Amino acid sequence: DVQRRLANGEKIDHVWVMFDKDDFSHFEEAHKKIEKLNNSKTLNVERLHYNTKNNIVWHSCWSNESFELWLCLYFCYYQSASKRTEYINFLQNKGIPYKKNLPNVHDILVEKGGSLETAIKYAKKLEKAKGIDNPSTGMYKFAEYFIGYMEK
């Protein structure tokens, strides 16, 4: 999609790459490659070339083990390495009818007593303690960047 947009003359400032570790064996390598894109002059992503003259900033928003960790952090500091099913059970015990791609998930989490600011704080704390090891998530980077738009 980035290549097509650039070819159409669109200006792209940021590319957000979001992914879970789950059973992805190249998780750490993918994270490093995305972060490294900001430091290289010419990028080769799956044989597609982007030149940094476009001033694109690349962001790696990982979740290790899964995205559902980010949702649990709205409520508490969750520092045990867990699987997706455990995170989903935690959310359901909070009364959240969680399913993948749940619309308005942020609003539902807040209605149930969760806080975006809490999730950001705990995600940063996990990253400081764990790096990208399980459990950790870089979703706070996306949230911090767009929080101003959410408040409008």
PLM-predicted stretches and their roles:
Residues V2-H14, K21-K152:
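C-terminal accessory helical subdomains adjacent to catalytic cores in phosphodiester-
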